[in-house]
Protein backbone atom coordinates (compact mmCIF):
# COMPACT_ATOMS: atom_id res chain seq x y z
CA UNK A 1 0.00 0.00 0.00
CA UNK A 2 1.04 3.57 -0.57
CA UNK A 3 1.40 5.91 2.39
CA UNK A 4 -1.93 7.51 1.46
CA UNK A 5 -3.58 4.09 1.17
CA UNK A 6 -2.44 3.31 4.71
CA UNK A 7 -3.82 6.68 5.82
CA UNK A 8 -7.22 5.87 4.33
CA UNK A 9 -7.25 2.42 5.94
CA UNK A 10 -6.34 3.89 9.31
CA UNK A 11 -9.12 6.46 9.12
CA UNK A 12 -11.68 3.81 8.19
CA UNK A 13 -10.48 1.60 11.04
CA UNK A 14 -10.77 4.43 13.57
CA UNK A 15 -14.39 5.22 12.73
CA UNK A 16 -16.65 2.35 11.67
CA UNK A 17 -19.90 3.85 12.95
CA UNK A 18 -20.91 6.07 10.02
CA UNK A 19 -19.82 8.12 7.04
CA UNK A 20 -19.61 11.36 9.04
CA UNK A 21 -17.20 9.84 11.55
CA UNK A 22 -15.09 8.29 8.80
CA UNK A 23 -14.75 11.65 7.07
CA UNK A 24 -13.92 13.36 10.37
CA UNK A 25 -11.29 10.73 11.21
CA UNK A 26 -9.91 10.92 7.68
CA UNK A 27 -9.59 14.70 7.89
CA UNK A 28 -7.74 14.43 11.22
CA UNK A 29 -5.37 11.79 9.83
CA UNK A 30 -4.94 13.82 6.65
CA UNK A 31 -3.97 16.88 8.69
CA UNK A 32 -1.26 14.91 10.50
CA UNK A 33 0.12 13.47 7.25
CA UNK A 34 -0.03 16.88 5.57
CA UNK A 35 1.89 18.44 8.46
CA UNK A 36 4.67 15.84 8.04
CA UNK A 37 4.88 16.38 4.29
CA UNK A 38 4.85 20.18 4.58
CA UNK A 39 7.47 20.14 7.35
CA UNK A 40 9.73 17.99 5.15
CA UNK A 41 9.29 20.14 2.06
CA UNK A 42 9.72 23.48 3.87
CA UNK A 43 12.43 22.31 6.28
CA UNK A 44 10.45 23.35 9.35
CA UNK A 45 9.96 21.55 12.67
CA UNK A 46 7.09 19.01 12.55
CA UNK A 47 5.44 20.21 15.78
CA UNK A 48 5.40 23.79 14.55
CA UNK A 49 3.89 22.79 11.21
CA UNK A 50 1.37 20.46 12.88
CA UNK A 51 0.06 23.36 14.98
CA UNK A 52 -0.42 25.44 11.83
CA UNK A 53 -2.15 22.64 9.93
CA UNK A 54 -4.45 21.70 12.82
CA UNK A 55 -5.61 25.34 12.95
CA UNK A 56 -6.51 25.34 9.23
CA UNK A 57 -10.13 24.93 8.17
CA UNK A 58 -11.25 21.97 6.07
CA UNK A 59 -11.16 23.81 2.73
CA UNK A 60 -7.59 25.04 3.27
CA UNK A 61 -6.41 21.56 4.34
CA UNK A 62 -7.91 19.99 1.23
CA UNK A 63 -6.37 22.71 -0.95
CA UNK A 64 -2.90 22.11 0.51
CA UNK A 65 -3.31 18.33 0.28
CA UNK A 66 -4.35 18.71 -3.35
CA UNK A 67 -1.04 20.46 -4.10
CA UNK A 68 0.93 17.56 -2.61
CA UNK A 69 -1.25 14.60 -3.61
CA UNK A 70 -2.82 15.76 -6.84
CA UNK A 71 -6.49 15.80 -7.79
CA UNK A 72 -6.74 12.14 -8.81
CA UNK A 73 -5.50 10.85 -5.45
CA UNK A 74 -7.71 13.27 -3.50
CA UNK A 75 -10.80 12.15 -5.42
CA UNK A 76 -9.93 8.53 -4.63
CA UNK A 77 -9.58 9.05 -0.89
CA UNK A 78 -12.39 11.55 -0.32
CA UNK A 79 -15.10 10.12 -2.55
Swiss-Prot record:
Intracellular or extracellular location(s): Secreted
Statement: the UniProt record of this protein carries the keyword Secreted: yes
Tissue: Expressed by the venom gland.
GO molecular function: toxin activity
Gene Ontology biological process terms from the UniProt entry: defense response to bacterium
GO cellular component: extracellular region
Record keywords, A-Z: Antibiotic, Antimicrobial, Secreted, Toxin
Secreted as UniProt keyword: yes
Family: Belongs to the cationic peptide 06 (cytoinsectotoxin) family.
Protein role: Insecticidal and antimicrobial peptide. Has insecticidal activity against larvae of flesh fly S.carnaria. Has antibacterial activity against Gram-positive bacterium B.subtilis B-501 (MIC=0.63 uM) and Gram-negative bacterium E.coli DH5alpha (MIC=2.5 uM).
Domain topic, free-text comment: The mature peptide may form alpha-helices which disrupt target cell membranes.
Protein's UniProt name: Cytoinsectotoxin-3
Species this chain originates from: Lachesana tarabaevi
Lineage, highest ranks first: Eukaryota, Metazoa, Ecdysozoa, Arthropoda, Chelicerata
Amino acid sequence: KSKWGKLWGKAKGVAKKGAKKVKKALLKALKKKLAKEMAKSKGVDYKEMKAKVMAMDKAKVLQEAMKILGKKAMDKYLS
